[in-house]
Amino acid sequence: MLSKIFTVAVLSAVSAAHAQTAPSSPLSFRTVKLEAKSCHGKDQENKPICHESTVTYPITGNRHLDNWVRKQFHGTLPTQRSVQAKLNRNGIVKYTNQENPQDMRKGEPPCRLQFADEWSLGGYTPNYAVFRHDTWEFACGPRGNGNTELFVLKRGAAHPQPVKLGNILLPNQKAKLANLLKADYVKYLIEIARDGKQEASEQETLETLEYVNGRFGNGFQITNNWRFDKNGLTFEYNIGELGTYAEGGPELTIPVKDLQGII
């Protein structure tokens, strides 16, 4: 999880490359949550078959940042009415309502759909704010489908735009960053394989590194989902983005001491 207020250590590292005056007033973590439900028929136990949708958005109290959030909804913030109307019009909902009676006649349980479109303020420093966008859809398969996006915005700008990782990296440092992330990913895979029971042997470490190199070669995939963290820079990967579903979606953190000369 993001720290509410990121530490000065990382901020100073970034500010060395981007020394600008920015507001330091606190931001609000208030979040508006809108929920909708659409019911159609009943199941074998005479319980309503309902589909649900959740939409959230933050109100930071900063006009420019809140305007940026509004733009993510095409200029108009959602309302209870609009969320309900969108769920009612959803083509997947209509199709599922048609299929459920047939499935129940076969003795199968009905499908109850779930949707989520959630924006939130993840954290901030005096110079930057990090927004999080989580989407989720469960359509009655073996598992749901989720996705996370992170957006780092420069505070103080009238029309803020997401800061790209390349904007804070020093020249020719991408490969070094990739190697640091790869090393942390190897540690992550070893930890989940051993479930923290004991230290990995040198042989296990070499085998895991060989497995990762077989997938990525000499490089490594650097995600656009990065954020400032109290310990350094953290890169969040979606489930399955680097490997199998079972390997999960790791959060790889490069500590401040290793960022020297990179940002």
Per-range role (PLM):
Residues 10-19:
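Hydrophobic h-region of N-terminal signal peptides that target proteins for export
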